[in-house]
Amino acid sequence: VPANGDVSAALAGDSPIDRFLAVEMSKHNIQPLPRASREALVRRLSFDLLGIPPTPEEVDDFVADGAPDAWERLVDRMLAAPQYGERWARHWLDIAHYADTHGFERDQRRDHAWRYRDWVIDALNADLPYDSFLQQQVAGDVLAEENPQANSTTDATIAASFLAVGPWDYVGQVETPSPVIKRLARADDLDDMVAQVMTSTCGITIHCARCHHHKLDPIQQEEYYALTAIFSGVKRGDRLVSTEESQRIDSKRNELKGRKLAIDQELNRTRVGISLADIVGGGNGFGTGTLGAGIDASTGAIRKPNDKKGFLDGVVANRLNTTTYPWIDSVFVPDGGTMARLAISQAGAVAQGIPSTDPKVWDAIRNGPVNSQFSTSLDGIECAPPGRSMLSLHANAGITFRLQKEPLEELQKSNAGSTDGGGIVFTAMVGYFGETASKGADVYVLIDDQLVFRYVGLGRNDGLQAIRHELPGGASTLTLIATDGGNGIGHDQICFIDASLAPSHRVESDEEALRVSELRKMSEELHAELASLPEARRVYGVVPEAPSEIRLLHRGNTEDARDVVLPGTVACVGPRMESIAALSSQSSDAQRRIALANWICSPENPLPARVLVNRLWHHHFGTGLVATPSDFGLGGALPSHPELLDWLANELHRGGWSVKRMHRMILLSDAYQRSSVRPESPTAVHSAVVLDAGNRLVWRQNPRRLDAESLRDTMLSVSGSIVHSMHGPGYRDFDYQEEYAPVYQHRVLETPDVFRRSIYRFVVRTTPHPFLTSLDCPNPATMTPVRNTTTTAIQSLATLNNAFVLQQSDRFAMRLQREVGDRAEAQAERAIRLAFGRKPTQTEIANAARLVQSAGLFQLCRILFNTNEFVYVD
C-alpha cells in the first residue's frame, strides 16, 4: 500500500484504495472532485446495493445524522438488507445466462429452475465465502454426497444447477433421429458449460480453443478438450433436491394410500352387485381378444386391424357380445374409426367432452397393453389379490356396456318408495398402471351421452381414485374410456378395480349404516391428508451420469474425432494439483468436478479473486479496473491500477473470501463517495477532462443509467405497487400456449404477483420482454458480464407510452392522492421527492403544480418517469 508520504495530502485518504488511486492522479496532476451531497450518496448506495431507491424518510434520516460514522452505519444496514441479495444476484445471473426456458426452437419451460436463482440470492445475503460459492456451483451435489456433515446437501445440489442454467437444444439432444446432429448438439452443450465455468470464475475465454490453439492466450486445443472431459458426465434435467426428503414424503403417501385403499375396499364390499370384469374376461379383465383398428396419427385414416392379442377375453372390435349377467345386455368395444362427438357404440353412447378431434389423443383406439409394461402393483400395494377384480383398458381404448331394460325397470319399481330414488349405482376405484416415467392418462366415464366422471392426467402418484355414480332411470349405456392424455404414449394402462353395478338402495341395519358413515368420514379425511402432502422438491440442474469418452475434434468437427483426451485443466493458469494429475478415463463425474472446483479455488490460482474484486469494482464504478471483466487474457483490457487489483485480491483472501467485506471496503473509500457532477467552474476540472475523459483514474464518480430491471423496480417502488415477497416460482407476465414450440405472449397484468421485483421474473429465452429489452436487458442466450447502455428512439417511446409505464403512472397518481390529498402543490412536492430522492426547489414545485392543474396528476407522474434525474444515478 502506498504510504501517505508518496502522494499529496490533498489526494491521500484514510483508505488504502484512495492511496492507490492517488498515486496515478498525482502522476498526471489531476485533482479529484469533492464528496457528493448526502442526498446523492444515499440514493447512489441504495441503487448499488439494493437496486431500488431509498424512501424520502430514509434520505431525511441520513441527511440529519451528523455522527462521524453515519455513512459507515448506512453501508452496514444496506449490506444486511435482504434486498442486497436480490440486487447482486442479478449481476451473477447475467454471467450465468440464467433463464426459465430451454431456448432454441422448442423453448420449453423449466418450471423448477427458480430454485437456483433463490440459492444465489440466499448465498449472497448469507455472505457465503466466495470460494465456497464457486465450489458449490461446480461440484456442490457431489461434494455434499461425499461429506454430508460439512455441506448442506439440499443447498449444494441446487447450487450445482449453475452448470445447467444456460440454453439447451432439446431437439438436437432428444428428438432428432440423426446421430450427427446429436453429436453436434452435445458438443455445443459441453462448450457452453466449459465457457461458462472458466469465464465466470477465471476470466478465461477458453472456447476459442475449441477448433484450434488459442490465437492470443497460451491455451492448447488439447487443454480445451481436457476441460470438456471434466463435464462429460453432466447432463441437464429435473432432479430431486433431496432424496431423503422424497423418500420421507413417498413413505408417508404410501402409508396413507394403503389405509385409504383398505377403507375404500371395505366400503365397496358393503354393496351387493356384479363385477364388470367378470363380464368381459375370466374374472380379472384379461384375455386374448382381437386388437381393434386404430386411427393413423398423421392422416386420421382408419388403420386395418392387426393380429396382436390384447385383453378383454372374447371381445372383438365393432361387435356386440351378449352376456348372461343381470342388467347387462351386451358389451361393445369400438374399432377407433369414430372420434369425439361421434357415436362410439351401436347402443347410442356419444363421447362428448373428450379432447379428441386431435389425432394425438385418439391415435389408436385399441385394447391390450404390452405385458412387460404392466403391473397390478401400485406404490408397492397389490391391487389384484385373490377375491379382487381388475378391468384393464389400454390407452386410447373404450368399452361400452349396454344395459338391459327389463331388470332395471323392475329394480326401480321395487325401490320406488326409497328415499334415495332407487336404481343401480356404478362404483369402482381407478388407477394408472403404465410406465412410471409417463405423465399419465385421462379417464372418462359416460352414462348414455353424458360425461359423469373425468380425471385428467391420472398418474402413478395419484394412487386409486374412487368413482361412484348412480345410473338414472332409463339409462341404456355405461361407457369407460381411457386416452393417452395427449402425450402419444400408447402403452399407458388404466385399471378399474372392483368395477361393479349394485342396487343403490338396500335395507341396512343401524350398525351397518353407522359403519358406512364412519368409513366414508375416514376416507374423506385420508383424502384430504393426501392432498395436503407436499411434492418432493425438484430443481432443474445437473443430472450426473458415467462420463463419456472425449476425443479431440479436428477443427471442432464432431465428425472428425481424433485422439482420446483425459480430463484436465490449462497449464498456463493455476497450480499443478495432484488431484488433477490423477484424473483418468476411469475417473467418476464426482472426482472430475471436485478436482476442478478445488483447482479453481486453490490459493495458488491467481485469477478467481482478481476476477471477483474486478466485478465488484465494475458494478460500483461503472467500469472495472480491468474493463473486460470476463477476459483477463491478452485479448482483454489491461488493468488501470494493477497494484490495486492485486491488493484487493489479497484482501479477499485475507478476509476469508467475504464478499460483503470487500463491498464495505470499496464503499467506505473517498473514491466511491466522490461527486459525479462537474462544478460550475469548468476550469477546475479542465485538465482532468482532457487527460482522462473516460475517468480511468477515478477522479470522479461515473453517472450511470439504471439498468432495465432497476428502472422497472423503481417505477414499482415509487408508485407504491412493489411487492417485496421473496423466493418461489417466477411471476409470469405472459400468456402461454402449449404447442410443439410453445408460444409466449407478454402482457401487462394487475395481479400482485407481477409487482414483485424483476429478479423474480420468469425469463423466456426466445421471447424477450418487449419493455425490458428496449432498455438493454440482455439476451440470456449468452453470458453478459457487461451490459450495453444504448440510447435509442425506441427507449423514449417505451418509457413514455409502454402499457406498464402508463399503468404505474396511474398508480403513482393514486398513491399521491392517498398520501397528500388533492392540493396540486402538495402532490407536486411529494411526487418529486419520491421520484428524485431529494427535496424540490420552489420553482420545481410551482412548475409541477401548474402541470397538474392543466394536464392532470397522471401526466406529471408520467413525465417524472421520463426525466434524466429519475433514470440516472449520480
For each predicted feature, which ranges?
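N-terminal pre-domain segments of enzymes
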Residues: V1-A10
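Surface positions of alpha-helical coiled-coils, especially the charged/polar e/g heptad sites
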Residues: D238-V241, E245-R248, K252, R259, ...
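A structural supersecondary motif
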Residues: R765, T773-M783
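Sequence context surrounding c-type heme c attachment/ligation sites in exported
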Residues: S152-N254, L772, T784
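Primarily short, surface-exposed interaction patches in extracytoplasmic proteins
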Residues: A9-R43, D48, I52-Q83, Y98-Q149, ...
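Gly-Asp-aromatic-enriched flexible segments
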Residues: Q265-E525
